[in-house]
Amino acid sequence: MDPSTLMILAIVAVAIIVLAVFFTFVPVMLWISALAAGVKISIFTLVGMRLRRVIPNRVVNPLIKAHKAGLNVGTNQLESHYLAGGNVDRVVNALIAAQRANIELTFERCAAIDLAGRDVLEAVQMSVNPKVIETPFIAGVAMDGIEVKAKARITVRANIERLVGGAGEETIVARVGEGIVSTIGSSDNHKKVLENPDMISQTVLGKGLDSGTAFEILSIDIADVDIGKNIGAILQTDQAEADKNIAQAKAEERRAMAVAQEQEMRARVEEMRAKVVEAEAEVPLAMAEALREGNIGVMDYMNIKNIDADTEMRDSFGKLTKDPSDEDRKS
């Protein structure tokens, strides 16, 4: 092959390699698109983005969109927000939506909201089109002991100024639930709540529950009201059952004490009987001693024996004539 031909082929190969490397590092088509859209951006700026590990189309495309919308946003602002981990496209879309809705929103504020983890585009849309939050059934007990369940619909609008650091929807729902329970609990009876559900919404709405949150409460509407359990009757029943158990326990305690006292009395009776038997055993000894010393005579001793015999005879008659019903009652 002719050396001149080889030289031409080598030059062509080198040119192809150089062009491939050039188009790899320099997004020419993106640069042309920016120029066609009227965005003045240097090709060296795009190369610098490559070197700073910034994907050029993630910055240039939102820049073109912002330029067409008439926003005063620079390349450095978008690139710095991208390097900070923000969503450049969502920020630009939020700025465009805010401009169309005549909402005052700067790029710095929008970028701060995005970096805080909030969906700034959704917040702008919610400022234009308020969101309805529906709570579950919230139960409260009126003063007459009847449980009342209420479901509310809360219409909120995003507060752009409080998106950073403001509480979310969960706080709104919790505060509204607390207000509903408090309003129902302060009602004299459940019929007032059923007759005038607006009383709940008006009372809750007047408490300023959106303080410190990222939302502004526009209205609170009671969607449904239902009657629950008779909590007062249940509590009274439980109290009566508890009182009954306490009374039974006290009665059982008194019965046990009575049984113990009865056993104690029986023991004392047996003790007294033992003492009587012991004393009776000493009587013959005392009589013998009296006879020995001459304190009593033989006739006195015989009279005593006759009296004992009469007493034993009367006891035997009494046992024979005792009423059987007395034995049944004792048994």
Curated annotation (Swiss-Prot):
The chain crosses the membrane at residues 6-26, 28-48. The keyword Cell membrane applies. One of its GO terms (cellular component) is plasma membrane. Found in functional membrane microdomains (FMM) that may be equivalent to eukaryotic membrane rafts. FMMs are highly dynamic and increase in number as cells age. FloA and FloT function is partially redundant; double deletions have marked synthetic phenotypes. Flotillins are thought to be important factors in membrane fluidity, especially during periods of rapid growth in rich media. Belongs to the flotillin-like FloA family. It is found in: Cell membrane; Membrane raft. Homooligomerizes. Interacts with FloT. Interacts with FtsH midcell. Interacts with PhoR, colocalizes with PhoR in FloA-only membrane rafts. The last 95 residues are required for correct localization. The C-terminus determines the oligomerization state of the protein; there are many small foci for FloA. Swapping with the C-terminus of FloT leads to fewer large foci. N-terminally tagged, purified protein lacking the first 10 residues oligomerizes, with 12mer to about 50mer complexes found. Residues 236-331 are annotated as: Required for correct localization. A motif (EA repeat 1) lies at residues 240-242. It is a multi-pass membrane protein. HAMAP family: FloA. This is Flotillin-like protein FloA. Disruption phenotype: No effect on KinC activity, a double floT-floA deletion decreases the number of proteins in the DRM, blocks the ability of KinC to stimulate biofilm formation. Single floA deletion has no change in FloT localization. Double floA-floT mutants have marked defects in cell morphology, motility, and transformation efficiency. Single floA deletion sporulates less well. Double floA-floT deletion makes no biofilm, has greatly reduced FtsH, sporulates less than either single mutant. A motif (EA repeat 3) lies at residues 278-282. A motif (EA repeat 4) lies at residues 288-290. The lineage of its organism: Bacteria, Bacillati, Bacillota, Bacilli, Bacillales. Its main location: membrane. Keywords: Cell membrane, Membrane, Repeat, Transmembrane, Transmembrane helix. Residues 312-331 are annotated as: Disordered. It comes from Bacillus subtilis (strain 168). Induction: Few foci are seen on rich media, when cells are grown in minimal medium more foci are seen (at protein level). Constitutively expressed in rich and sporulation/biofilm-inducing media, not controlled by spo0A (at protein level). Pfam families: FloA (PF12127). The gene is floA. It comes from the Bacteria. A motif (EA repeat 2) lies at residues 251-253.
